[in-house]
Amino acid sequence: MRVKICGITNLEDALVAIEAGADALGFVFYEKSPRYIHPQEAKIISKKLPPFVERVGLFVHEEPVKIDEICSYCNMSLAQIHFDVEESFFEKLQTKALPVVRAKCAEDILQFSDRYRLVDAYVPEFGGAGRRVALEWFENIDCSKIVLAGGLSPKNVSEVKRYGFYGVDVSSGVEARKGKKDPQKVREFIQKAKFE
């Protein structure tokens, strides 16, 4: 199962995550988030990362042109679209994109079922809230294109492995405080998600 550590705000946290085995790092380009990072800072961090690490820019209520501009400037390899959009929105993007399904009910997780997508619990504040999607919603469905997010931590990530998710995405579950990761929690989360 692949692992994305989201809400990276500094190089130290990025390197700890990569060393521990993270497949992807998430950078939040949403100014209202406590994990917001200025594109200039993200670019500096991105340049210092080793190859073969996915760099994901998270966006809320941005136009495709602006998303492409920031992703290009910061060397992001993927744009995570963390707001409700139609399929046509993705056609306007030059950057490869991952839609986010903010699920309120079981039917919601079937949105964008023909493509890779991130499924998170619906919360008004757009992520990082630690709210969890009901796992029973994933019974008897193909989860191989789903990245699960929301309410994950080193204590519970092992529970989700049996569903066959493509990956998991964690932010608040591995923090010492908002915007700063706890290295021990990061290592423990990745160990349990990938290697146990």
Swiss-Prot record:
Protein's pathway: Amino-acid biosynthesis; L-tryptophan biosynthesis; L-tryptophan from chorismate: step 3/5
In terms of CDD domains, this protein maps to: PRAI (cd00405)
In the UniProt record, does the keyword Cell inner membrane occur? no
Q: Annotated Gene Ontology MF terms? A: phosphoribosylanthranilate isomerase activity
A UniProt-annotated Pfam family = PRAI
Q: Which UniProt keywords apply?
A: Amino-acid biosynthesis, Aromatic amino acid biosynthesis, Isomerase, Tryptophan biosynthesis
This entry's Enzyme Commission designation comes to 5.3.1.24
Q: Check the record and name the InterPro entries matching this protein.
A: Aldolase_TIM, PRAI_dom, RibuloseP-bd_barrel, TrpF_fam
> Could you state one GO biological process linked to this protein?
L-tryptophan biosynthetic process
Q: Which SUPFAM superfamilies match?
A: Ribulose-phoshate binding barrel
Amino-acid biosynthesis recorded as keyword: yes
Catalytic activity from the UniProt record = N-(5-phospho-beta-D-ribosyl)anthranilate = 1-(2-carboxyphenylamino)-1-deoxy-D-ribulose 5-phosphate
Source organism, top-level taxon: Bacteria
What does the similarity note say? Answer: Belongs to the TrpF family.
* Name the UniProt record assigns to this protein: N-(5'-phosphoribosyl)anthranilate isomerase
Q: What is the lineage of its organism?
A: Bacteria, Pseudomonadati, Campylobacterota, Epsilonproteobacteria, Nautiliales
Give the encoding gene's name: trpF
